[in-house]
């Protein structure tokens, strides 16, 4: 019994060490698609004080390539789902300066030539960006009909998003996500890939040692069953 308790303790320590190791790679450090998505957010004015929140989120919401890269940035599926499903609703938020009231376009929109739509169309009235809805509800979507693939992929993601973000394993993700919607225009956002720190050699060595020791104990336990 003591051996089993020790074995599970080592497994738990190994998992905790692995979480500590990958937290520096949360979201933008995952892969090339995440890096491209980060650059696209900077292009839309993530750290530009002259770009309003509505312009910034509308620029991202209307960028099909951004959603594609974000969907492929799947190191943490629940976080990717949360960001992609919320960013368009942020584009409709009221402001004393302006209110974005347009629909997604097949064109990529930059902040330099952005202008609000004059059409009386609202995301909140016509399309609800939840895990159960599909972009095909909009009959005028042509290129965006491919979002049905995205919707079906998203539906398989975990639905308990906030509870996942609150776990200690991805606290770095929660901080990154929060910076999008509360302080997207400041230079303190974590979207800048220069803030990503890679694990030191000592961290990798410790994790490897813990993993090897855990494997040895597991092997001995398995062997004892037949002796």
Curated annotation (Swiss-Prot):
Propeptide section residues: 201-227
UniProt keyword Signal, yes or no: yes
Glycosylation sites: 192
Lipid attachment locations (GPI-anchor amidated serine): 200
Annotated keywords: Cell wall, Glycoprotein, GPI-anchor, Lipoprotein, Membrane, Secreted, Signal, Virulence
Function comment: Probable GPI-anchored cell wall protein that may be involved in cell wall organization, hyphal growth, as well as in virulence.
Protein name, UniProt field: Probable cell wall protein PGA42
